[in-house]
Amino acid sequence: MKFLVINGPNLNLLGLREPAIYGSRDFAVLQDFIRAAAHEAGVEVELFQSNHEGAIVDAIQAAYGTADGIVINPAAYTHTSVAILDALKAVALPAVEVHLSDVSTREPFRQISYAGMACVKTYMGLGFEGYRQAILYLRQYLEEANA
């Protein structure tokens, strides 16, 4: 089983960007955490990060036929990108949305998630642990769907 894990804009600045919200661990630590969580779950992961909406859309499209599912933290594009929503719907791979912070308790403009409309589940406010939960959930979801 293989998952594409997508991280959107500014996540490459973890540790620098608003540590009171996102924590002090940097992006390399997050990548290591995701790899370890995938290994523990017995799944393969491909990691992708971009600050560019079109590159994220391209990565989602490229996952068709090469990945079994997607874990996505679209970051700021969560609240603005119909293009990412449409790409997720087009490839029709099961996807799980992750947010480090609890976006439901933040600014009003963060209350809508376009990407979440195409996802089977969302984890928010769990920090890095949200990625582990997403990987485990997606594995279980696929196992049950293929049973």
Question: Language-model features: where?
Answer:
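Extreme N-terminal starter segment of soluble prokaryotic enzymes
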Residues: 1-4
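Glycine- and acidic-residue-enriched helix-capping/strand-helix junction motifs
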Residues: 14-28
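Short beta->alpha junction loops
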Residues: 46-54
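Short acidic active-site motifs
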Residues: 55-59
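Short acidic/histidine-rich motifs immediately flanking catalytic phosphotransfer sites
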Residues: 63-70
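Helix-loop-strand module that forms the ligand-binding subsite of alpha/beta enzymes
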Residues: 72-110
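Short, glycine-/small-residue-rich phosphate/pyrophosphate-handling segment
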Residues: 96, 105-147
